[in-house]
Amino acid sequence: MEKPIFVTQPNLPPLEEFIPYLEIIWQNKQFTNNGPMHQKLEKKLCEFLGVEYISLFNNGTIALITAVQALGVKGEVITTPYSFVATAHSLVLNGLKPVFVDIDPKTLNIDPRRIEEAITPETQAIMPVHCYGNPCDTQAIADIAQKYNLKVIYDAAHAFGVEDDDGSVLRHGDLSVLSFHATKVFSTFEGGAIVCNSKEMKEKIDRLKNFGYIDETNINIIGSNGKMSEVNAAFGLLQLEHMDTFLRGRMNADMFYRQKLKDITGISIVIPSGQKISNFSYFPILVESDFPLSRDELFNYLKNQNIFARRYFYPVIPDFQAYLNVGEVCDVKNAREIASKVLCLPMHAELSSDILEYIVSTIREIK
């Protein structure tokens, strides 16, 4: 395969469909500060996702940082070691102590049993991650939070459009945070959002992302600049028009992989758990000891064949140099083992059957 096959690529609607949105922005001469595109996208996303309130951000990391501030969390926050570093960064940048507990080796999400074991008088919140879009055990986490009077902020960066038996997974917890980065199922180039359940919280979040302003002459809280631009919001509106097509393409790729890889000795496929509607955001496999190559050897072998998989998430967060003396690390042996075996295969809406067959046959031919 001459053309490189990347682990992901952005969903791009026809360029000519984006031009009318840009023309409206040029006519309005408002590029940011809660403009009409921004307002329309918030409304459309609430409808699409089935949530009450949403506040758009310039990226998911600023949204995570702001979510912590909106709830006034102090002290310790229990979270997963198996995630992108922005999860823990949002805590450390707020002066909080992350406490890393282990994951369930089947779902790859934070293990509720480990959460309860790690609670101390300093614990104020839990920050779980719906890893790869697979919902956490939200009921168990809610029960723990209620028992110990803890806040729950879900890092839902992977979970756009995911539903469980209760509806949108974004409705769980006190707040849920989305990422609209170019690599995500739904993208605004760069972007993010906080989903909340009350008008009062939505207003507080909106103030926090706009320097704390109440009106032109009053600030009652110290905030930052987390606003999404009109161009980003416009692209999001256009993306929504094509979401069914994008999701169908990802679903077809997911089904192809599951069918073709299921009987390869030494390759384990992560089984979806808890979702009624999936977004097929990633396709992780686990390279076991009885496969002819190690995970890293397979990673390099695929790269030599122009297939660029990714080791999401390796290493676990507390094993990064920046975290060696930060927070507290409980026994996270499951997370470390999964991190040593995981490999995410290319997954996006435009993977043709020929490309998928090439990826699968490249893996199958390894002896």
Curated annotation (Swiss-Prot):
Q: Per the entry, which co-factors are needed?
A: pyridoxal 5'-phosphate
Q: Which domain of life is it from?
A: Bacteria
Keywords of this entry: Aminotransferase, Lipopolysaccharide biosynthesis, Pyridoxal phosphate, Transferase
Q: In which pathway does it act?
A: Bacterial outer membrane biogenesis; lipopolysaccharide biosynthesis
Give the Gene Ontology MF terms in alphabetical order. Answer: dTDP-4-amino-4,6-dideoxy-D-glucose transaminase activity; pyridoxal phosphate binding
Modification N6-(pyridoxal phosphate)lysine occurs at: K184
Q: What Enzyme Commission number does this protein have? A: 2.6.1.33
Q: Which InterPro entries match?
A: DegT/StrS_aminotransferase, PyrdxlP-dep_Trfase, PyrdxlP-dep_Trfase_major
Q: Which reaction does it catalyse?
A: dTDP-4-amino-4,6-dideoxy-D-glucose + 2-oxoglutarate = dTDP-4-dehydro-6-deoxy-alpha-D-glucose + L-glutamate
A Gene Ontology biological process in which this protein takes part is: lipopolysaccharide biosynthetic process
Q: What is known about temperature dependence?
A: Optimum temperature is 37 degrees Celsius.
User: Which Pfam families does UniProt cross-reference here?
Assistant: DegT_DnrJ_EryC1
Which purpose does this protein serve, as stated in its record?
Catalyzes the conversion of dTDP-4-dehydro-6-deoxy-D-glucose (dTDP-D-Glc4O) to dTDP-4-amino-4,6-dideoxy-D-glucose (dTDP-D-Qui4N). L-glutamine can also be used as amino donor.
Q: Which family is it part of?
A: Belongs to the DegT/DnrJ/EryC1 family.
Name of this protein: dTDP-4-amino-4,6-dideoxy-D-glucose transaminase
What is the organism of origin for this protein?
Shigella dysenteriae
Which gene name does the record give?
vioA
